[in-house]
Each structure stands twice: as C-alpha cells, then as structure tokens.
C-alpha cells in the first residue's frame, strides 16, 4: 500500500510539471498578469480637450459669419423695401397734401361765416329756421357746435349782432318729468344761464333759446334761428 501511494504522488507531480506549473510560480510565489495600458490617459484627455476647444472655436466663428451674412442681407432687404415704399407712397402723399389743402380752404371758407364776439367766434344764423336737432347738425357740419354762452357779456355781444329773434343754443332737457338742463358739448350743467321768469314747465323735450337778453325753453321740434360757436370743445 505504501508503494502504491508513492506511485500516485509521482504521477500527480509529473502532470503538474507538464502543465507548466513551475513557470507560474517562480521562487515558489504566484503572480497576477500585468494589466493592459488604459486608452484614456491624462495626456489623451488633454488632446481631446484641445480638439474640442478648437472645434468649438471654429463652429463659433462659422456661426458668427452666418449671423453677419444674415444681418447684411436683412439690412439690404430693408433698404430695398424702404425704397419701394417711398416710390409707392409718393402718389398717396400728393393726394393727402391736396386733400389737406382742400380741407384748409374749406375751413377758411366756413370760418368766414363766424363773427368775433369777445375772444370767441360765433355764427348767428339769421335766415334759416330749424328744429333744435337740425340746428345741432348744421353747426357740426360747419365744424362748429351749438353755442355755449359763458357769461352775460358774451350773451349781450351775440344779441347785439342779431336781429330781434329767437335763437337755439346748446342747452336742453330731453328727459320728461324731471331731469336737469345740460350742455351736449360738456355733458354737464351750463356755464351760464339767465332764465326768463314765469315759463311753462309742462313742455316736453325742453330746449333752450335766447331772446331779448334772456333764456327761455320751448319744445325742441319748434323751428327757430340758432347760434353756432366755432370751437368744438368746452
């Protein structure tokens, strides 16, 4: 039995020797295989960074060049568009100048119909008889407004230029059964009133007229002369 165990050990030794086990363990110690050199070393990272910096700089320059080209094209297109618009607008400018001249001439003609009273201008219609509403429209067509009389001096000045007649002015009370007299120009109560005493308060649609240096009211659909003021504001 001792001899058979010895033969078994010798056989194992021969197999280990044939497999190169002695080469793997020099001086009786095992060693690991040498590691491979890594591809992404610090130097390689630096090279890649320089590459990307260069690439980004080139792309940035390329982008800036594209933007400059686009700006030049846009500027050129705008100049061309402006030139075309100037050409196309010339006839319109001529028409507008002509129209403005006509308006100015028309306004001058209309202003000749107004007379100066104090610091303001009024048109005293002495021939045409209209309802209060028609008189309002007529004054607007003259680029004026039914008169808002500001004080007694102005009232006396207007009536001094007018024959003894009744003249609509811009004061009315169109609400039945109550309400107050207002100016259509301001939407408020009038600046100045000088009422005639003992007036009929039962009249509907009461509109104000001046007569004999006093103010009275009548139904708005009655026909009377009227006074326009040149200014269209209060």
From Swiss-Prot:
InterPro entries: C-type_lectin-like (IPR001304), C-type_lectin-like/link_sf (IPR016186), CTDL_fold (IPR016187)
CDD domains linked to this entry: CLECT (cd00037)
A GO molecular-function descriptor: signaling receptor activity
Pfam families per the UniProt record, alphabetical: Lectin_C
Disulfide bonds, paired cysteine numbers: 139-228, 207-220
Outcome recorded upon mutating residue 104 to E: In strain: SFS 1.2
Cellular location(s): Secreted
Effect of residue 105 to S: In strain: La16 and La35
Cleavable signal peptide: 1-21
Coiled coil, from the record: none
A Gene Ontology biological process term: sexual reproduction
Effect of substituting residue 27 to S: In strain: SFS 1.2
Tissue/organ expression: Main cells of the accessory gland and in seminal fluid.
Residues of the C-type lectin domain: 137-234
Glycan-modified residues: 61, 164
UniProt keyword annotations, A-Z: Behavior, Disulfide bond, Glycoprotein, Lectin, Secreted, Signal
Function of the molecule: Responsible for physiological and behavioral changes in mated female flies.
Protein name: Accessory gland protein Acp29AB
């Amino acid at each position: 039995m001792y001899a058979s165990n010895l033969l078994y050990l010798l056989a194992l030794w021969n197999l280990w020797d044939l497999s190169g086990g002695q080469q793997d363990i020099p001086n009786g110690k095992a060693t690991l295989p040498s590691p491979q050199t890594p591809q992404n070393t610090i130097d390689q990272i630096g090279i890649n960074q320089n590459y990307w910096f260069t690439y980004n700089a080139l792309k940035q320059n390329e982008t800036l060049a594209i933007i400059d080209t686009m700006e030049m094209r846009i500027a050129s297109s705008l100049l061309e568009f402006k030139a075309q618009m100037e050409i196309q607008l010339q006839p319109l400018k001529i028409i507008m100048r002509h129209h403005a001249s006509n308006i100015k001439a028309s306004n001058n003609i209309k202003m000749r119909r107004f007379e100066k009273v104090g610091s303001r201008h009024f048109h005293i219609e002495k021939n045409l008889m209209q309802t209060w509403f028609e008189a309002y429209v007529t004054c607007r067509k003259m680029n004026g407004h039914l008169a808002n009389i500001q004080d007694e001096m102005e009232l006396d000045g207007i009536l001094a230029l007018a024959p003894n007649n009744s003249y609509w002015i811009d004061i009315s009370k169109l609400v039945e059964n109550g309400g107050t007299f207002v100016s259509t120009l301001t939407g408020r109560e009038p600046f100045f009133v000088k009422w005639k005493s003992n007036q009929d308060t039962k009249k509907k649609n009461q509109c104000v007229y001046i007569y004999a240096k006093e103010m009275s009211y009548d139904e708005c659909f009655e026909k009377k002369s009227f006074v326009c003021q040149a200014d269209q504001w209060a």
